[in-house]
Amino acid sequence: MAGDELKGKKRKYRDSHSGDEKSVKILPLSESSLPPLVTTISGFYPPENTRFQLLKKSNQSNRDASLIGRTERVQFEAKNQSTATVEANYCLAVADKTGRVKKIVPAKYLNTFERNILALQEKDKFLKKKHGTVSGTVMEQRANLGLAFGTRKSQKAIMEESANRVKAETLGDVKDQLVSNVQKATEALPTQEDIAAAQAQDRPIPPVNVGAESIEDAYKLEDIIPKEEFSAIYIKPLLENPDERNWAKLLPYRHSLFINERFQRLLSIEEVDQKRARILYYISLLQAFLFSRRSVGNRETLRKKLADPPEILIDGLIKRFTQTTGIGSVQVSSREVDKIICYILVLCLIVDNYSTDVLTLANDLNVKTMKANELFRTVGCRIMAYTETQRMALGLNKTDAKNHKRAVLKIPLEFPKPRRGRARN
């Protein structure tokens, strides 16, 4: 039963393709007409705009036809070097848009494709004219003997070896053309600055100018806190309450040692720096948002936990530090958590003139010191020990100073290099 089905399938296949076989036309070729010429190219390709011309003497057959093309420096020649009395026949298939073959056209295959440096050709002509023809090397003589008396297999191997042979002087003369091609191919490649900028975009950090020439230009305040939001921060009630017990209650997050120390210091000055006060308030808002992130789906609850800030500030937090899940809910992912912390770190660096204590902020943000060091490096900082003068100014003893490091932002910024996987054996 299976054999009958198989035979039936074969008959159906032959019947379905019988029409195709009848539709194929084989075009005859007379001795006088020239067929399409086909060759194979390996190695250095001629430029696309190279024009080739047919070279064929009137008293020669189509077998001896060749193609020659030239650029300013190189001559390309495709020809037939076969010594066989009987040659293989080649043809080209002409297909329609569906891929169905409609015509078969006889073609001529040129089995060698050579490149010659025009400058070397002129030099060879000059030497031959001056010294006469010089006999070839032993290898060339052996190759000539092989072509004359060798088997078809050896003749084919000799011709392939000759076609693919690379000469040192040839490479020396075409190097300019190769370099030009490489330059064109690499024009679209990104520069080191482009790569650094792209890597910065992949990091959970505020917008950064990796090529900044001054530390103030590395992180612009308006890129971290938009101007509309910055101007919406209302700090007058805070400034009117010099008592810490009063103004601390007005902050979105009350338990930050960093904020409380600097706000107290700020209020002790006769003329308060309102810009710095607004930055401290926004740092406190980010800290409150960080610890209230699980309430981000309920705006009313979130507003209460953030101490009722202006709506534009809540909108900005949700826009920059949340993402929408597949079911339409809003959440703060682990990457967004790192992003919030990085924004806080950069703002703290701005407040502390780009050098701040790592341990203080690690405790404020409830992260391990190692994690804080990692995120400081992510924003471009260097982790450094305190100098003896700095230690004494901070009132730290030598034992405590071992646990305290400072994160310093310097130009040029230094970012961690991308991690690479281990090489496989």
Curated annotation (Swiss-Prot):
**Organism listed in the record:** Schizosaccharomyces pombe (strain 972 / ATCC 24843)
Q: Name one Pfam family in it.
A: RNA_pol_I_A49
Protein's UniProt keywords contain Nucleus: yes
Region of interest called Disordered, as start-end residue ranges on this chain: 1-26
Q: What is this protein called?
A: DNA-directed RNA polymerase I subunit rpa49
Q: What does this protein do?
A: DNA-dependent RNA polymerase catalyzes the transcription of DNA into RNA using the four ribonucleoside triphosphates as substrates. Component of RNA polymerase I which synthesizes ribosomal RNA precursors.
**What's an example GO cellular component term for this entry?**
nucleolus
Compositionally skewed regions (Basic and acidic residues) per UniProt: 15-24
Q: A single GO molecular function, which one? A: DNA binding
Query: Highest taxon of the source?
Result: Eukaryota
Biological process terms in GO annotation: RNA polymerase I preinitiation complex assembly; transcription elongation by RNA polymerase I
